[in-house]
Amino acid sequence: MYSVLVQETPMALLQLLKEHSSLFAFSLLILLLKFIYKDKSRKRRVKLPPSPPKLPVIGNLHQLGNKPHLSLRCLAEKYGPIIYLQLGEIPTVVVSSARLAKEVLKTHDLALSSRPQIFSAKHLFYNCTDVVFSPYGAYWRHIRKICILELLSAKRVQSFSHVREEEVARLVRRVAEFYPGTTNLTKMLGLYANDVLCRVAFGRGFSEGGDYDRHGFQKMLEEYQELLGGFSIGDFFPSMEFIHSLTGMKSRLQETFRRFDELFDQMVTDHLSPKREKEEHKDLVDVLLDIQKKESTEMPLTMDNVKAIILDMFAAGTDTTFITLDWGMTELLMNRKVLERAQAEVRGVVGERRVVLESDLPQLDYMKAVIKEIFRLHPPAPVLVPRESMEDVTIDGYDILAKTRIFVNAWAIGRDPESWEDPEAFEPERFIGSTIDFKGQDFELIPFGAGRRGCPAVTFGTATIELALAQLLHTFDWELPLDTAAKDLDMTEVFGITMHRIANLIVVARPRFP
């Protein structure tokens, strides 16, 4: 669910070069000599995937552009669905078709199940001891098992149904308050996503203020997203990692980590306090602390492990819910017939009841098709979190050497004309009668990844999205402001750890019920 290619790569790189030109010149000279020596000393001939021309030292970094998912699709259209890039010091393979995604995520899943050590992730996620960024091994298998069996099981997801229902009701009240004026729906959806995950993870919301909010939680999240999704030269030139101390990147990471760690320490202290009121339903911190207390295995969880897992759950979950709902409502307002059909279905199932129940959701086939179409065109992470090969493998006749970084362009796969008819059109009808799903078995549609590294929170995320979308469709009639035409909505993407719309969605939401 994260994407960690660079944001505004060329500009960031040029700014760094400008500020530290002498140091970079010396460092790049060393790298150039190193590359020349490496090329001359290579003894074994290998058959690498097709590759565009590269520059000395930086390799193909300059070809990523401001929106790497688009640049990589353009390269795939020219060189094929599997390409080789030299991103600084990092050998990289990018796949952009469902057939080859299956090779990476299923056929060679185990051999390609590790993670590269991302500079920002090491500093934010307790030295990569979370589920997403931890390298493959016994520890990762242990914490993933905890996530699947304890934190995100079907029973656990169901136990949080009251949280989803209460937060959806709060979302509806917030939106209704602005009628007959306009509503910044993007902001409302962001509050909903944050509050659901905060209550599930920590036992309380944040948008209403309180003790935790004095830490500036929302600002911390924004800084975290910027740091994790921004350009980090150490990720492509590991031998030059020392430069982060000079550019200020390392100090920013350390300060953001310190603030999160302080907040998590307070949360854990609150949960362990004997004066804390017993909650009817345990939150995720409760569950992890119980596991930590009971575990007698050779691999007990440390408190830092607990905090890393919680940050993972929260960071991944909020963005997925928010982005999907924001893109979804935007697409529906641009496609009025789809909106009307989805509303008619929901209202036909729910009737005159004001509240959509989770038991209504299995009957909403067309709305589920709408959500699949949102995931196809706007996967939260356009490029899946990179994998790293643990051994040599062969894909499509090409040699993929150990320690190669592997990117899967989920955005390009969702728009591949080899897999989809009229791929740029928003047409949920394509999923009616289709067995294609987004849970990792159909490689044409992989917004949550697949295989061992697939997102374990699919069930939770889907429930959070479906209930909110159904209730919004049921409760309100939706229009754009009089001065805004659907064709003029800004669909510009902001590429980072996830892919947001650059503009807020401003709407008029007319309540159906008094």
Swiss-Prot record:
Topological relation to the membrane, as annotated: Single-pass membrane protein
Protein's cellular compartments: Membrane
PANTHER family: CYTOCHROME P450 71A9-LIKE ISOFORM X1, CYTOCHROME P450 FAMILY 71 PROTEIN
InterPro entries, per database record: Cyt_P450 (IPR001128), Cyt_P450_CS (IPR017972), Cyt_P450_E_grp-I (IPR002401), Cyt_P450_sf (IPR036396)
Residues modified by glycosylation: N127, N184
Gene name per UniProt: CYP71AP13
Entry coiled-coil feature ranges: none
Entry keyword Heme: yes
Domain of life: Eukaryota
Family annotation (SUPFAM superfamilies): Cytochrome P450
Signal peptide: none
Cofactor(s) of this protein: heme
GO cellular component: a single term: membrane
Keywords: Glycoprotein, Heme, Iron, Membrane, Metal-binding, Monooxygenase, Oxidoreductase, Transmembrane, Transmembrane helix
EC number: 1.14.-.-
Species this chain originates from: Prunus mume (Japanese apricot)
Sequence positions that bind heme: C455
Protein name: Cytochrome P450 71AP13
GO molecular function list: heme binding; iron ion binding; monooxygenase activity; oxidoreductase activity, acting on paired donors, with incorporation or reduction of molecular oxygen
CDD domains noted in UniProt: CYP71-like (cd11072)
